[in-house]
Amino acid sequence: MENHLISQNNKNYIFETKLFHNFKKLKREGGLRTKRIFKKSSSSKPLITIITVVKNNSKTIKNCIKSVINQNYSNIEHVIIDGGSSDNTVSILKKYSNHIDYWISEKDNGLYDAMNKGLKLSQGEYIGILNSDDTYKKNSLNIILKYFKKFKNIDFVFGTVFKGRILSGFWPKKILWKLNIYSAHSVGFFIKKNSQKKIGFYDTKFKYCADRDLFYRMIVKAKMKGKATNKKELIGYFTEGGFSESLNFIGRLLEETRIRLKNKQNIILVIILFFVHLIYQLRKFFIK
């Protein structure tokens, strides 16, 4: 009965209030930054930003977060970009809000759009990428910093990771990079913030392999310098069957070809590499 007695102005006010309340609920965010707690670099303790992208991965995101919390190095900024999860992921992010510098949950335009959001939010001198189903070893960031301090002129470090077997993060062979053939894993990848600004962001036109495009632009075009960690200095554990592994290999192969053409590789070489990779993938598929 009371609802019928509300004036038109009051109805508008109630509607606008509910609309504003619902809008606030749509933007789910948390972390230390929302409490006005910001970390800074110092000469002895440079700030390292770790970017994690997640969507509906409540089974592994907790271990990912804990592997950052448990680092022996203390000056870390963890930024987590959630693509609007509908499972228990956001509840886990809320639980660890006092250990995460900033997290946000909202719809995005895919993995690399979310990665770019994280890069734009990063404040550290160095930036690392840690997928939501991957983890670091306890001493990983100390190892990475050791390389940046020892080799002052480098732009990036590729760390050794474990993915069923030990995989070296970087082959510093110019010919391999010009062919866009290399071993590079995001869990072991770290870059100076200033160097990242020079090469820009992931190209979101690529759904599957934008990291390959970025690495190619970084090393072959911008001629940035990097180092690989010693094979005995394991940085982290790269989960098999993650995002990149579960993608349609034909779609991924076609996209790799587009990246080669975009970066103006020799067209004959591009065709040869396409068929070499196609045969390799088909053999893997049928030999299973």
Go through the PLM ranges and name each one.
Residues S105-S122:
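Glycine-rich, basic loop-to-helix element that forms the pyrophosphate-binding segment
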Residues I127:
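Short aromatic/hydrophobic "clamp" motif used to bind/position activated sugar donors
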Residues F170-R252:
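Conserved nucleotide-sugar donor-binding catalytic segment
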